[in-house]
């Protein structure tokens, strides 16, 4: 990674604002309007061509993609032969089965933990406002944070994720890493200045996001089960409770709003359509920023571990592969294309893996 100059200033609230320059990842333009370098340039003509609101085949293709990544029934999952499934498992073995090998690879290095929330620390539920983590999981994550620097990286609004997790000692990267804040003052032993890190590379988009959120609420209210969530720096349109026969209508309504906003892009997650600013920023970039903030940006003795279940987590898995450090763990019961090195099937296995990490660290405090 390119060398970075970091300018730090402290506000009255105790939050540290960090401006980073001379970097291939964090450019001075990161806080400028959408036309500045560092943003994805998408012409209005090209955007309309890609969305093709009036083209039925485009809508159908998008719905097929929604269906493929969000199966409602086991029969919706592409069938694999025993050889194909075994091949996938060999390429992405269980992190629990490979625990000793993982520990051996991290020996002599500082482990840094990155955790997605929905589907990783909490089960996927029909109502996104009720995606609560268990008390056992919360206690486990708290123990992990005492052993290693730990961050929650989620597509959710940072404040919403914090209201679920309620642990002041963690780093939180909400809105796919576009809203990053460190531990509450005095709660982290890894930040020597005991202050919080605040980084919001898409702050210029806040008024636009609010405007689009209101339009999406209005345009989708006639689709039963659709839920629009304002995650501050992005908007999520949940279709988990929408009848599959209505997915095409929902996609049409979402796209009819976005055709007026070339500054925003549409991405897809697990039973959710997500609208984000067109900046070169994702969970992988957030991972790099947090490593920089912790002093591990150009360090060979760091071992980042990222655990997540969604498409958006692939950016972080890919970043770890490119860095040649640490590894990613995909949480999924079914084989799927991924840049992760290992796999776990569900949040219960995530908790087992985290507990084993804590037990190992407590037995080897100097390692």
Stretch-by-stretch model annotation:
Residues 112-114, 171, 305:
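Hydrophobic "anchor" residues on beta-strands that sit immediately upstream
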Residues 126-128, 164-166, 185-186, 249-252, ...:
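Short coil/turn segments at secondary-structure boundaries
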């Amino acid at each position: 990674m390119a060398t970075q100059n970091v300018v730090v200033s402290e506000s009255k609230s105790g939050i540290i604002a960090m401006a980073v320059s001379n970097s291939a990842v964090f450019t001075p333009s990161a806080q400028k309007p959408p036309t500045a370098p560092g943003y994805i340039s998408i012409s209005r003509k090209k955007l309309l061509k890609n969305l093709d609101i009036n083209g039925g085949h485009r809508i159908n293709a998008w719905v097929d993609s929604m269906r493929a990544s969000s199966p409602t029934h086991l029969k919706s999952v592409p069938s694999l032969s025993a050889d194909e499934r075994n091949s996938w498992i060999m390429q992405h073995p269980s992190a629990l089965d490979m625990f000793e090998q993982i520990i051996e690879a991290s020996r002599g290095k500082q482990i840094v933990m990155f955790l997605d929330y929905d589907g990783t620390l909490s089960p996927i539920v029909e109502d996104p406002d009720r995606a609560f983590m268990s008390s056992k999981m919360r206690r486990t994550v708290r123990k992990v944070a005492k052993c290693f620097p730990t961050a929650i990286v989620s597509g959710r609004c940072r404040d919403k994720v914090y209201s679920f997790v309620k642990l002041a000692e963690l780093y939180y990267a909400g809105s796919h890493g576009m809203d990053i804040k460190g531990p509450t003052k005095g709660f982290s032993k890894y930040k020597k200045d005991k202050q919080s890190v605040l980084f919001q590379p898409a702050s210029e988009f806040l008024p636009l996001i609010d405007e689009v959120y209101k339009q999406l609420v209005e345009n989708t209210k006639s689709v039963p089960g659709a839920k629009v969530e304002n995650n501050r720096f992005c908007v999520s349109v949940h279709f988990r409770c929408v009848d599959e026969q209505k997915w095409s209508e929902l996609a049409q309504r979402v796209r009819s709003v976005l055709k007026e906003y070339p500054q925003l892009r549409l991405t897809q997650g697990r039973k959710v359509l997500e609208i984000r600013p067109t900046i070169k920023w994702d969970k992988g970039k957030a991972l790099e920023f947090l490593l920089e903030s912790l002093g591990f940006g150009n360090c060979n003795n760091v071992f980042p571990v990222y655990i997540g279940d969604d498409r958006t987590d692939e950016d972080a898995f890919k970043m770890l592969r490119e860095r040649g450090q640490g590894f990613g763990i995909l949480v999924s019961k079914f084989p799927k294309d991924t840049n992760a090195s290992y796999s776990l099937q569900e949040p219960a296995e995530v908790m087992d893996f985290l507990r084993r990490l804590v037990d190992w660290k407590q037995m080897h405090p100097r390692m």
